[in-house]
């Protein structure tokens, strides 16, 4: 009897697999537990599963156990997701992209020279895990995401396993920045086990990452596809609709190392939307300074500073 027709424990929004299970090569860094893919197959019951970044073949092992067909591809075996056409119209795609450059694959997990000899291209030039900048990685990841989603048959699904990266005090979130085409059906949190961070004591305010995400998107229309994507921008607080007068005045003063004249505050705020939206903006600045003694200090006549000791 095929695995996916058995009675299994339903998927929930949090999954955990302390024991990895059998399938794929556990020496292949970043390899996920086949139990996750087995549970996805058991829950959604596809007749076939495709994986275009298959790594060591964990998806095939899960599909074989479930008794369904699998089609697997990877850069190390002649398939470049950025330039090759997807040959199928998949019903279900499992995608486990690299987590930026945390683990590099070409010429680390496999020999680039072997790929060059067999397929005629240098995988290091095409490897998403060798992209230097985060922004360029996101662009490549999102192109690959849209390419796979576009190939889905109507009603098909993609399950994307991804994680977050921390570098130099900043979080780089794949979940936040990956493009989300179609219907966003589920986000599953997957606990990580046997991580390097489990054995490491961190100083400062570093919070170790002990989870990944599984994002499931569904194609509900063959032609018109809704897309949810992140747009990064920089906004001046003096132009932000939600900023109060106290916020704006404090922001200007926070840049100053010594008390400044009231005229300086006028100059800094006048060109911006906060002032342009209020006919009595000068009066509002003076009122804001006077009614917030906890935050602003009147140092001498006409000069103000930010009280940096305020709670």
How does the language model describe each region?
Residues 1-292, 298-311:
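Class I S-adenosyl-L-methionine-dependent methyltransferase catalytic core
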């Amino acid at each position: 009897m095929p695995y996916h027709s058995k009675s299994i424990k339903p998927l929930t929004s949090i999954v955990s697999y302390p024991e990895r299970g059998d399938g794929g090569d556990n020496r292949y860094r970043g390899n996920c537990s086949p139990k996750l893919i087995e549970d996805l197959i058991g829950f959604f019951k596809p007749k076939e599963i495709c994986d275009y970044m298959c790594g060591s073949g964990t998806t095939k092992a899960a599909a074989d156990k479930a008794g369904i067909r699998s089609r697997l591809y990877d850069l190390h075996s002649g398939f470049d997701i950025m330039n090759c056409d997807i040959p199928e119209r998949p019903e279900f795609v499992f995608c486990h992209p690299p987590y930026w450059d945390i683990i590099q694959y070409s010429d680390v997990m496999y020999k680039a020279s072997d790929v060059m000899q067999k397929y005629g291209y240098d995988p290091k030039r095409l490897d998403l895990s060798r992209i230097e900048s985060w922004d360029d990685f996101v662009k490549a990841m999102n192109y690959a995401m849209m390419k796979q989603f576009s190939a889905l048959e109507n009603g098909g699904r993609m399950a994307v396993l991804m994680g977050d990266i921390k570098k130099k005090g900043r979080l780089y979130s794949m979940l936040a920045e990956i493009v989300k085409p179609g219907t966003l059906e589920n986000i599953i949190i997957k606990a990580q086990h046997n991580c390097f961070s489990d054995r490491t004591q961190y100083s400062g305010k570093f919070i170790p990452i002990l989870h990944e995400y599984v994002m499931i998107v569904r194609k509900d229309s063959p032609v018109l596809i809704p897309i949810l994507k992140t747009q990064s921008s920089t906004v001046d607080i003096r132009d932000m609709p939600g900023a109060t007068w106290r916020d704006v005045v404090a922001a200007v003063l926070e840049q100053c190392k010594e008390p400044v004249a009231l005229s300086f505050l006028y100059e800094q705020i006048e060109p911006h939307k906060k002032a342009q939206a209020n006919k009595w903006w000068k009066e509002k600045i003076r009122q804001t300074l006077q009614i917030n003694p906890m935050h602003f200090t009147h140092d001498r006549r006409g000069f103000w500073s930010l009280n940096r000791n305020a709670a």
